Amino acid sequence: MRVCFYTLGCKVNLNETGALEQLFRANGFTIAQEGEAADVFIVNSCTVTNFGDQKSRKWLRRKKRENPGAVTVLTGCYPQAFPEEAAQFMEADLVCGNGDRKAILENVQKLLDGHERIVAIAPHQRGEQFEELPVERFETHTRAFIKVEDGCNRQCAYCVIPVSYTHLRAHETRSNL
């Protein structure tokens, strides 16, 4: 099985996509590059601007049109921040937020086995544990990323991140060292 990832947005998304690639590779998938054939197409979306939302939808629409039998996945900040809108995007076979990333593989397996469309977006809860997503190597970057937190508690009027992440979740400092 081949899986292709498309990542929009910040370095956090790049890091999370790297972790997902590693997870899929460890479970027998081959990573396909943009333009190559694949059985699964996953967009890790950004919602800092509505342009990011639009690019995510456009990419998945194109992949679904070009590969009607493939599984398409919309994940990331866009479905987390706007779950009702993202759930209505029917070109995605799996719509999930930025919570339980490791469940993406399990849900993709269900879809490959013939399961119906899955929408799995859960709001973040206060006290929720930071999700460990280790990345052993970065294919396209010369520098590694160390993810230390998700979200922000600042509540700036112009920023959507607190809508997407709700509560700040931080990595234990000593485990970073």
What do these predicted regions represent?
Residues 1-169, 175:
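Proteins enriched for Cys/Gly/acidic motifs involved in redox and nucleic-acid/cofactor modification
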